[in-house]
Design a protein with these regions (language model features):
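Mobile, glycine-rich extracellular loop/lid and propeptide segments
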Residues: 1-254, 270-296, 300-310
Length: 310
């Protein structure tokens, strides 16, 4: 690999969140980078790049925070966590979390122009803490609403419900799909017995925290990292049809390097060590690849999900 171009924001933040997530519009040759600290999207042109040089790119900032707060007086911006472009390049969606960690988020939906500019088409309310946004197709947008207990579990703290929001991009409507269907004593026990990690005395609808989504054949595969699981969402039915354990790693068989006292990589096996795989990120593709992120693919008529584990 050789670098042919780059963009420098000129900004720095000890907490991160500057130029964190990037989406590329193949139809217009523009990239959009998320700056969650400022609520800005930076539009960067990728036209006229050559393999012979190292071009310093320029960017144009788009004030997503200001646009959304001006149009939706009930929303107080907290963070912009994700951005995605529709397959045909006509739409862009940005996921925004509320300032209040127990309040619903928003998905801002824009029309894309060939000059890189964006036109706000509408704002859709999502579940709590949308952490990732993805287009299932040109007309359907999904957000993974993580619902983390950001102030712990003490008195007065809230543990928000995790969910996935299904958005109709044309009608600008959203349906928040949660995990209430797994809250019965019988179904919760079945999840635990299958290897899914749940907090004691907590309902799955409260404890599960969607983080990332891969889409294939009308279904969304949703990583639940802390629960060591992947949930399957039927998009037509708008309901979760199953939650499946990612299993456990046997490090008496699989070598691992857990010694961080030096910079060397020296994996070895441990006779009595087991690990939780904790699936994290995902993206849909028809090709077989491995290692970060999760992938959805078709093989001999069956859908396969490939998930790298931390």
């Amino acid at each position: 690999l050789s670098k042919i171009a780059g963009y420098t924001s000129g900004q720095y933040n000890v907490d991160g969140g500057v130029m964190e997530i990037i989406a590329y519009n193949t139809a217009t040759d523009w990239a959009y980078a998320v700056n969650g600290q400022t609520g800005m999207l930076t539009a960067i042109s990728m036209e006229n790049l050559t393999a012979n040089g190292s071009l310093e790119l320029t960017g144009t900032e788009i004030d997503v925070k200001g646009l959304v707060e001006n149009q939706d007086a009930t929303f107080s911006y907290g963070d912009m966590t994700s951005v995605a472009v529709s397959p045909d390049g006509t739409l862009l969606a940005a996921a925004l979390q509320s300032e209040g960690y127990n309040d619903s988020g928003r998905a801002a939906i824009f029309g894309c122009s060939s000059d890189g500019s964006l036109t706000l088409r509408g704002i859709v309310e999502t579940g709590i803490q949308p952490d990732m946004v993805v287009f299932a197709d040109n007309g359907t947008i999904l957000t993974a609403d993580e619902g983390e207990p950001r102030e712990g579990y003490g008195n007065g703290a809230a543990d928000p419900r995790g969910s996935v929001t299904i958005i109709n991009a044309e009608e600008l409507t959203g349906t928040v799909v949660g995990f209430d269907g797994f809250d019965s004593e019988e179904k919760r026990a079945a999840l635990v017995s299958s290897g899914i990690i749940l907090k004691k005395n907590t309902a799955p609808s409260v404890d599960l925290e969607p983080e990332y989504i891969a889409v294939s054949d009308g279904k969304a595969y949703v990583t639940l990292q802390e629960a060591n699981a992947i949930a399957v969402l039927n998009l037509a039915d708008q309901a979760f049809e199953g939650i499946y354990s990612a299993g456990f790693e046997d490090y008496s068989v699989s070598p691992v390097d857990i010694d961080k006292k030096d910079d060397a990589y020296a994996p070895k096996t441990y006779g009595s060590l087991r690990g939780i795989r904790m699936p994290r990120r995902g993206r849909s593709t028809e090709r077989l690849i491995s290692r970060q992120p999760m992938k959805g693919m078709d093989a001999n008529g069956a859908t396969r999900i490939l998930e790298p584990f931390i």
